Amino acid sequence: MTAKPEHYDVIRKPVITEKATMTSEANGVVFAVAMDATKPQIKEAVEAIFNVKVKAVNTTITKGKTKKFKGRPGVRSDRKKAYVTLEEGNTIDVSTGL
């Protein structure tokens, strides 16, 4: 499957944190994705861009915090992350660019 331009709209960037690194040891990868992206869209995009087989996709939405900017209250943007579990034998090196 070849990657289409809309696949790059679904997957924004890889998430590199301590928890994401621990997930990679269990054959998983974490991506920041578009808020309106669905699990089937995320699965299709990952399989097309990285040429791997996806076993499961779990998503989480983090609500933006209320913070003060120059003394006035403001709200940070909401974020959606996708925890992608890969089939055995498939790997993704997130240190290389998308």
Curated annotation (Swiss-Prot):
Function (record text): One of the early assembly proteins it binds 23S rRNA. One of the proteins that surrounds the polypeptide exit tunnel on the outside of the ribosome. Forms the main docking site for trigger factor binding to the ribosome.
Coiled coil stretches, renumbered: none
GO biological process: translation
Single Gene Ontology MF annotation: rRNA binding
Keywords per UniProt: Ribonucleoprotein, Ribosomal protein, RNA-binding, rRNA-binding
Subunit structure of this chain's protein: Part of the 50S ribosomal subunit. Contacts protein L29, and trigger factor when it is bound to the ribosome.
Protein name: Large ribosomal subunit protein uL23
HAMAP family reported for this sequence: Ribosomal_uL23_B
PANTHER family: 60S RIBOSOMAL PROTEIN L23A (PTHR11620)
Any GO CC annotation of this UniProt entry: ribonucleoprotein complex
Superkingdom per UniProt: Bacteria
Family that this chain belongs to: Belongs to the universal ribosomal protein uL23 family.
Classification via InterPro entries: Nucleotide-bd_a/b_plait_sf (IPR012677), Ribosomal_uL23-like (IPR013025), Ribosomal_uL23/eL15/eS24_sf (IPR012678)
Gene3D superfamilies: 3.30.70.330
